[in-house]
């Protein structure tokens, strides 16, 4: 049973469906002058005007009573919709049939046909399962099972949502702006359209001449050619949208109705005023609403708490005569309440509004307390029961085929996958992330335990979903799929890095700027449990590509995409500090990457030595966050070697040019040679450094100790730097101050040496680093922070002066109100034998709870910055005259410190294991056995002195840079009377074949006590 009313009668007309015993009215739809009735047996009846073929049959111009549409009799029809003069029907297989007026393309049959009397299948949609359709006056919308929206028909106001310059369309077109968004509904009005997402976001497009899109802000357009997210509806909790000719009504989760648009007929439910624009609550409705529906110029609402059907607005005023039996009067203001008393013994099921006609379906069950709402067909998504069914199905069964079909659809559609894990909607502010990643992770884990499901998911992602990712969508709901995919185990399978992870990363890199910003905001809210696996997935793919070699242009493009995505993630993490920085380090790079080639490419590119049209290879150095400390030092070494080689090549070219042109002047040396006397070491070295040109520092450094036999080896320069720093950092030398006994050193507040000496000392430090040397420079970490433009902290002061740092910490921790009086603290300090006010008249300003943090901050700033400004700036200027700041900025302070001073984490057992044996020696040789036994008896200081004898330094490079080892040799000319000798640049120890422990211990002491100088190639016992 159903009720209808409209034109000539204020009374409800109670009707039963004719010609279909036992069938009830399931759905009704009305155009301007015709109606469709869909029955529960899936037959479609039509009545009204047929001048444009809108009844779906030939013959009479009008159908006074509802009659079946014969062309649809063989179909199981699930949905119907009416435009002004055209009709649509959807069968249970999702096929769409159209008939009626088609001059604007609104039938979607591929031609602008004036009239189509019989329903025709829309062939463009033949392979797509449509679950919803909605007709505007002259256009149509369809929603597919996989959440695609199609539009066709008239586009004079942009109501198709296809963008600018699109004419009317005779075939369905995808509304690409909505791709990836899990949708709940589509609704068409006169010349405007809406879509509602499962998250509750409303998207409107088309005509906005009367404000029917609810767009806000300055310069509101009169039409929109693309779907726009309607901000005014965002936080209302919209669950249903209905559109009239030029007005719109929305129903919220809490049973309220908001309307907007044209109000000339009172269709918005409040007094017509031109000032009221945007969504307005219909306050006159007394109770909670569960259904709404818009006619062209009026609105219906079912108030389930009172059992009333509320109607406001009226039919168009230009109608001159009755239309059909379902709407018998003209120009009638139907703003009234239809009482629950009219529905005796029945309960309202659904309401439907047309231009003139209104329908109410009922059911007999009056005991139900559940609010009857309109249940719309939904897009595909995974439910827990569905997942369990998939896991349980037997292979080759009917259920198995159905499961495969469901999996194929969901895992091929970004929107369906997102819909599967949406968080429960609320009526308040939207959550930071729309999807439940923990639920997704658990579901994917269960599903992929089944090999056939895992294989299907992989295929669907590779063939369809990754190609359909909404890279240019500005909507968070569409981009949520980028959060879900990394939760799936198949994305982490080592076999899938190239076919899944690389395309995924490329999609991120191809995003529009706006889309990427939205995605990055989502990344910023990720928990460690989601963010870390995402990073590990990318790292694993990069390693896999490197293991497969990076030769082709495509290989380089793959790595660029992976690194590009990691770069964006790194930016997000840096701003939010979710994960430690070293999470992004790819430790394997230190062994897999050729740093010389990589740095060379970067230098060539930066110096414009590569033609612009040449395909550029990936340069890992452009992504320094992937480098661990070892990789950064190797990159620094590569940079030094390349620059030395370039400098040497340039010098030889100049020499060649000089010879050819017979020039008188002697060309510059290809080496940077320092000739120094050991007795005047510092003076000689600083004099020559001050005379050097900037280009000299890029050359290979050669140090010659005058009157000594100095092989061109790293060992000589290592000893040079060791001796220079040892001398210049002594307290008695006067360049640096030591706040406490055994503490680190720092720049003095009132230096005794001239400022230039600090400049030269900075050059010396830079030269040591550039030449890959490590030296003992007892500076605190604060120095390396300052070199990298970072601010020293209280922790740095604790390192420089433990006692002072501890006392300042106590000041911060002290909760007493009279802290300044109790401790006699003022804004005046004593530092480096000077009394200093931290602020003007600081001696008279006590420290209290309100200013103690400022006091500590100014104390730290004075020590590390204010007091040393002049001398530190000279030091920094000298340091960066040699070293390139661009490459050092990639280091963290701790890493730069390690690169400069090395480490003293000695592993003497490993030292023994790493060692090699040549010229008749082997590990089991008696002399070797004696050596290690004697060596391990030495004190730590003696072992360090022996290390200096062997290598020219008593410190180690950063772990992994250089093996700590000895290469044992026994020249035939050696006798037991000879002492051991070393070749420092190669860690070679020439060890005579001693036969007793006493002789071995004696020889080691000689080496330890004569570990400096190059007077003779061999120390021989007299």
UniProtKB/Swiss-Prot annotation:
Domain named HECT: residues? 693-1017
Cellular compartment(s): Cytoplasm, Cytosol
- Which Gene Ontology cellular-component terms appear in the entry? cytoplasm; cytosol; nucleoplasm
Which residues form the RCC1 repeats?
41-92, 93-145, 147-198, 200-253, 254-304
Pfam families in alphabetical order: HECT, WD40_RLD
EC no. given is: 2.3.2.26
| Gene that produces this protein | HERC6
Could you list this entry's UniProt keywords, alphabetically sorted.
Cytoplasm, Repeat, Transferase, Ubl conjugation pathway
* Ranges in a coiled coil: none
Q: Which reaction does it catalyse?
A: S-ubiquitinyl-[E2 ubiquitin-conjugating enzyme]-L-cysteine + [acceptor protein]-L-lysine = [E2 ubiquitin-conjugating enzyme]-L-cysteine + N(6)-ubiquitinyl-[acceptor protein]-L-lysine
Reading the lineage from the top rank, the first entry is Eukaryota
What are the recorded GO MF terms, alphabetically?
A: ubiquitin protein ligase activity
Active-site annotation: 985
Q: Name one GO biological process term.
A: response to bacterium
The annotated pathway is: Protein modification; protein ubiquitination
How is this protein named in the record? Probable E3 ubiquitin-protein ligase HERC6
Q: What does this protein do?
A: E3 ubiquitin-protein ligase which accepts ubiquitin from an E2 ubiquitin-conjugating enzyme in the form of a thioester and then directly transfers the ubiquitin to targeted substrates.
Summed up, the tissue specificity of this protein is: Detected in brain, heart, placenta and testis.
Principal place of residence: cytoplasm
What organism does the record attribute this protein to?
Answer: Homo sapiens
């Amino acid at each position: 049973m159903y009720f209808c009313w409209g034109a000539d009668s204020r009374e409800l007309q109670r009707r039963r469906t004719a010609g279909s015993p036992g069938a009830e009215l399931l759905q009704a739809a009305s155009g301007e002058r015709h109606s469709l009735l869909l029955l529960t047996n899936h037959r479609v009846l039509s009545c009204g005007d047929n001048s444009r073929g809108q009844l779906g049959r030939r013959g009479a111009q009008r159908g006074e009573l509802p009659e079946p549409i014969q062309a649809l009799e063989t179909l199981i029809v699930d949905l119907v919709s009416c435009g002004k003069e055209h009709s649509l029907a959807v069968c249970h297989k999702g096929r769409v049939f159209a008939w009626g007026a088609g001059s604007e393309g609104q039938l979607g049959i591929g031609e602008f046909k004036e009239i189509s009397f019989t329903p025709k299948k829309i062939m463009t949609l033949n392979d797509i399962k449509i679950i919803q359709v909605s007709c505007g006056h002259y256009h149509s919308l369809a929603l597919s099972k996989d959440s695609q929206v199609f539009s066709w028909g008239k586009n004079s106001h942009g109501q198709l949502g296809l963008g600018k310059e699109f004419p009317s369309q005779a075939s369905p077109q995808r509304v690409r702006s909505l791709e990836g968004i899990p949708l709940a509904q589509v609704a068409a009005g006169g010349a405007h359209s809406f879509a509602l997402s499962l998250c509750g976001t409303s998207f409107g497009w088309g005509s906005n001449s009367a404000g029917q899109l609810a767009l806000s802000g300055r310069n509101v357009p009169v039409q929109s050619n693309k779907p726009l997210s309607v901000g005014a509806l965002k936080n209302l909790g919209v669950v249903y949208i209905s559109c009239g000719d030029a007005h719109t009504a929305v129903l919220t989760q809490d049973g309220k109705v908001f309307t907007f648009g044209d109000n000339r007929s009172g269709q918005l439910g409040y007094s017509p005023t031109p000032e009221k624009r945007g969504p307005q609550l219909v306050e006159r409705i007394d109770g909670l609403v569960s259904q709404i529906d818009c006619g062209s110029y009026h609105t219906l609402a079912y108030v389930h708490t009172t059992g009333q059907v509320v109607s406001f607005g009226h039919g168009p005023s230009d109608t001159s005569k009755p239309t059909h039996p379902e709407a018998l009067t003209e120009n009638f203001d139907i703003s009234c309440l239809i009482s629950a008393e009219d529905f005796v013994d029945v309960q309202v099921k659904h309401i439907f509004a047309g231009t003139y006609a209104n329908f109410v379906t009922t059911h007999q069950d009056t005991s139900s307390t559940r609010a009857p709402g309109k249940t719309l067909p939904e897009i595909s998504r995974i439910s827990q029961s569905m997942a369990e069914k998939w896991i349980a199905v037997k292979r080759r069964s009917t259920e198995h085929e159905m499961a495969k079909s469901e999996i194929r659809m969901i895992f091929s559609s970004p929107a369906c996958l997102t819909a599967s894990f949406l968080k429960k909607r609320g009526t308040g502010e939207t959550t930071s992330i729309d999807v439940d990643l923990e639920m997704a992770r658990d579901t994917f884990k269960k599903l992929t335990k089944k090999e056939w499901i895992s294989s299907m998911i992989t295929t669907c992602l590779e063939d369809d979903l990754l190609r359909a990712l909404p890279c240019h969508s500005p909507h968070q709901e569409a981009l949520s799929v980028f959060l879900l995919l990394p939760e799936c185990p198949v994305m982490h399978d080592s076999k899938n890095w190239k076919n899944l992870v690389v395309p995924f990363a490329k999609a991120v890199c191809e995003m529009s700027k706006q889309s990427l910003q939205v995605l990055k905001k989502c990344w910023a809210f990720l928990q460690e449990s989601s963010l870390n696996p995402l990073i590990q997935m990318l790292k694993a793919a990069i390693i896999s590509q490197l293991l497969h070699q990076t030769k082709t242009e495509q290989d380089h493009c793959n790595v660029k995409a992976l690194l590009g995505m990691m770069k964006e993630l790194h930016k997000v993490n840096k701003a939010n500090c979710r994960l430690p920085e070293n999470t992004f380090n790819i430790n394997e790079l230190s062994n897999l990457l050729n740093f010389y080639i990589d740095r060379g490419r970067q230098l060539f590119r930066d110096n414009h030595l590569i033609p612009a049209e040449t395909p550029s290879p990936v340069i890992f150095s452009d992504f320094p966050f992937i480098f661990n400390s070892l990789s950064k030092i190797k990159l620094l070494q590569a940079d030094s070697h390349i620059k030395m080689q370039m400098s040497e090549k340039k010098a030889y070219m100049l020499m060649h040019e000089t010879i050819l042109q017979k020039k008188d002047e002697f060309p510059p040396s290809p080496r940077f040679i320092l000739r120094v006397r050991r007795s005047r070491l510092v003076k000689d070295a600083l004099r020559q450094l001050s005379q050097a040109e900037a280009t000299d520092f890029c050359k290979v450094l050669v140090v010659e100790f005058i009157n000594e036999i100095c092989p061109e080896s790293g060992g000589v320069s290592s000893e040079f730097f060791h001796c220079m720093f040892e001398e210049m950092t002594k307290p008695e030398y006067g360049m640096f101050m030591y706040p406490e006994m055994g503490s680190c050193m720092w720049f003095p507040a009132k230096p005794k040496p001239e400022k230039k000496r600090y400049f030269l000392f900075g050059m010396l430090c830079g030269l040591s680093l550039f030449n890959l040397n490590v030296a003992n420079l007892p500076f605190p970490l604060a120095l390396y922070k300052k070199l990298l433009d970072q601010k020293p902290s209280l922790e740095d002061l604790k390192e420089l002066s433990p006692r002072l740092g501890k006392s300042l910490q106590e000041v911060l921790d002290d909760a007493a109100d009279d802290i300044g009086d109790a401790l006699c603290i003022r804004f005046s300090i004593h530092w480096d034998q000077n009394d200093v006010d931290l602020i003007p008249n600081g001696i008279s300003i006590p420290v209290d709870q309100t200013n103690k943090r400022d006091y500590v901050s100014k104390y730290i700033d004075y020590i590390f910055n204010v007091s040393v400004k002049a001398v530190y700036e000279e030091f920094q200027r000298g340091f960066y005259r040699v070293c390139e700041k661009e490459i050092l900025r990639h280091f963290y302070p701790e890493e730069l410190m390690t690169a400069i001073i090395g480490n003293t984490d000695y592993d003497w057992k490993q030292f023994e294991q790493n060692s090699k044996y040549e010229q008749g020696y082997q590990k089991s040789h008696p002399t070797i056995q004696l050596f290690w036994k004697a060596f391990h008896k030495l004190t730590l200081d003696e072992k360090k002195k022996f290390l200096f004898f062997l290598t020219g330094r008593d410190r180690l490079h950063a772990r992994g840079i250089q093996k700590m080892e000895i290469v044992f040799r026994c020249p035939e000319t050696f006798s037991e009377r000879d002492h051991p000798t070393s070749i420092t640049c190669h860690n070679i120890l020439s060890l005579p074949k001693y036969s007793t422990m006493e002789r071995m211990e004696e020889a080691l002491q000689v080496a330890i006590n004569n570990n400096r100088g190059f007077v003779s190639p061999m120390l021989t016992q007299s």
